[in-house]
């Protein structure tokens, strides 16, 4: 008979994230004395349909960003509703909190409160059962290490002083033989890029996610600079590394309204069809394998056209489009919008709902990418999640800043634990034609 891991108490506290803003940390205590801890991350560019992060809005504390209400909800309502529940049944744990919240977007108790507790309960259960978190969440089938999607140049709203409209330019080490080696490759390219930027007299200070934010003039210049860094580090673009981009184009609002896009920095205006052709030309010119949020989160018709145009050879990732939400993902699958989903725990607000979103994506042939937020903590749950459900890709910043590197270091440990059964998929992590 399986052990019943009774929850005895839950406590919350206000801690700081990597941007110096408050966030929620929770601890779940089991009757056997085990403790699990979890923390909620926070995003800078947030999708309109994300679960609600509860903030105090008291301007006298942390500029209104305090989370004492969310913490109080953990110490009272959540503590009461989880008393006596089995922590190993993550669906029951999350269902109890969602029922106590009573809203669709978790705005009553706060998605940040619910998520921190959801992670803490899963961790407590895995510790009590003496198994790694990835095994607890995914069973014995989780053995694939993810290919990193490393953000090394920032643009858009992550780098307001540059001329780059695309929010993130990333490298993906598709030709590496193992996770340990892929991490080395990426670090070497990162340092080669730093050297190139220094030679040009450009800034090498890092942004929220560890990437550089140099004053480059255009998106194409950013791509070409990255390819130069790949070669300088001794690798071959296309074979060893592919490029991924996060356009975050829901931020590109035009006065002309829906179906139109205006690049805030370049000033160029596009219709959805013109923007699709812009992406197609970039993909023909450069070894781009993935584009995230290439169109607005409500432009479903445009997304279908984009997928028809590029979906057979480029990974088209919905972040703001799907917000880790099974209802929106289901609509996308039905329409043929995109072919991949970015998985962010705090967009939906619980571990069990995140697992369901990944399972739904995989069932429909979509790839899933385990992702961080720009405001992160030392919590490494997304690393375990990537292996648990074989997402095969992870997006968690540059090989710089300890809250980003913590996830990569956890994946190194997992690869070591898995030993001979560990698989690094490389180019096979994608569901597109890679000829």
From Swiss-Prot:
Question: Which GO biological process categories is it annotated with?
Answer: glycolytic process
Q: Which InterPro entries does the UniProt record give?
A: Enolase, Enolase-like_C_sf, Enolase-like_N, Enolase_C, Enolase_CS, Enolase_N
**Is Secreted found in the keyword set?**
yes
* Name of the protein in its database record: Enolase
Q: EC number(s) for this protein? A: 4.2.1.11
Lineage top rank: taxon = Bacteria
Q: Does the keyword Transmembrane apply?
A: no
**Which compartments does it reside in?**
Cytoplasm; Secreted; Cell surface
Q: Which HAMAP family match?
A: Enolase
Kindly state which reaction or reactions the protein catalyses. Answer: (2R)-2-phosphoglycerate = phosphoenolpyruvate + H2O
Biochemical pathway? Carbohydrate degradation; glycolysis; pyruvate from D-glyceraldehyde 3-phosphate: step 4/5
Cofactor mode of binding and number, as noted: Binds a second Mg(2+) ion via substrate during catalysis.
Coiled-coil ranges from the UniProt annotation: none
Family to which this protein belongs: Belongs to the enolase family.
Which Gene3D superfamilies would you find in this protein's record? Enolase-like C-terminal domain, Enolase-like, N-terminal domain
- Give any GO molecular function from the UniProt entry: phosphopyruvate hydratase activity
Main subcellular location of this protein, as a coarse class: cytoplasm
Q: Which cofactor does it need?
A: Mg(2+)
Provide the Gene Ontology terms for cellular component.
Answer: cell surface; extracellular region; phosphopyruvate hydratase complex
Q: What does this protein do?
A: Catalyzes the reversible conversion of 2-phosphoglycerate (2-PG) into phosphoenolpyruvate (PEP). It is essential for the degradation of carbohydrates via glycolysis.
* Species: Lachnospira eligens (strain ATCC 27750 / DSM 3376 / VPI C15-48 / C15-B4)
Q: What class of enzyme is it?
A: lyase
């Amino acid at each position: 008979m399986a052990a019943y891991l009774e929850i005895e108490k839950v406590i919350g506290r206000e801690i700081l994230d990597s941007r110096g803003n408050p966030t929620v940390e929770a601890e779940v205590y089991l009757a056997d004395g085990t403790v699990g801890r979890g923390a909620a991350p926070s995003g800078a560019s947030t999708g309109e349909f994300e679960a609600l992060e509860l903030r105090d809005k008291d301007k006298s504390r942390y500029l209104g960003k305090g989370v004492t209400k969310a913490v109080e909800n953990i110490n009272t309502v959540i503590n009461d509703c989880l008393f006596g529940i089995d922590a190993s049944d993550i669906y029951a744990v999350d269902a109890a909190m969602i029922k106590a919240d009573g809203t669709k977007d978790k705005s009553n108790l706060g998605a940040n409160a619910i998520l921190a507790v959801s992670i803490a309960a899963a961790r407590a259960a895995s510790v009590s059962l003496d198994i790694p978190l990835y095994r607890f969440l995914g069973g014995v089938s989780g053995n694939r290490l993810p290919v990193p999607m490393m953000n090394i140049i920032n643009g858009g709203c992550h780098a307001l002083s540059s001329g780059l409209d695309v929010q993130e330019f990333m490298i993906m080490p598709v030709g590496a033989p193992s996770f340990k080696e892929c991490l080395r490759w990426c670090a070497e390219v990162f340092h080669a890029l730093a050297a190139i930027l220094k030679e040009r007299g450009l800034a090498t200070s890092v942004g929220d996610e560890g990437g550089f934010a140099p004053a480059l003039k255009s998106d194409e210049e950013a791509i070409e600079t990255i390819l130069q860094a790949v070669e300088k580090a001794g690798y071959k673009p296309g074979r060893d590394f592919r490029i991924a981009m996060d356009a975050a184009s829901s931020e590109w609002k035009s006065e002309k309204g829906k179906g139109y896009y205006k690049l805030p920095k370049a000033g160029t205006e596009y219709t959805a069809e013109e923007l699709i052709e812009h992406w197609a030309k970039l993909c023909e010119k450069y070894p781009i394998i993935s584009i995230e949020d290439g169109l607005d989160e409500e432009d479903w018709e445009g997304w279908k056209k984009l997928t028809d145009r590029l979906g057979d050879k480029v990974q088209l990732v919905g972040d703001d489009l799907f917000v880790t939400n099974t209802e929106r993902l289901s609509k996308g699958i039905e329409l043929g919008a995109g072919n991949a989903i970015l998985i962010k725990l705090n967009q939906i607000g619980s571990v069990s709902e995140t697992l369901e979103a990944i399972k739904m994506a995989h069932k429909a042939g979509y790839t899933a990418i385990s992702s961080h937020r720009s405001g992160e903590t030392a919590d490494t749950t997304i690393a375990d999640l990537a292996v648990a459900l074989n997402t095969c890709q992870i997006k968690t910043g540059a090989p710089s800043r300890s809250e980003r590197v913590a996830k990569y270091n956890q994946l190194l440990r997992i690869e070591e634990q898995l030993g001979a059964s560990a698989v690094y998929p490389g180019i096979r992590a994608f569901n597109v034609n890679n000829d």
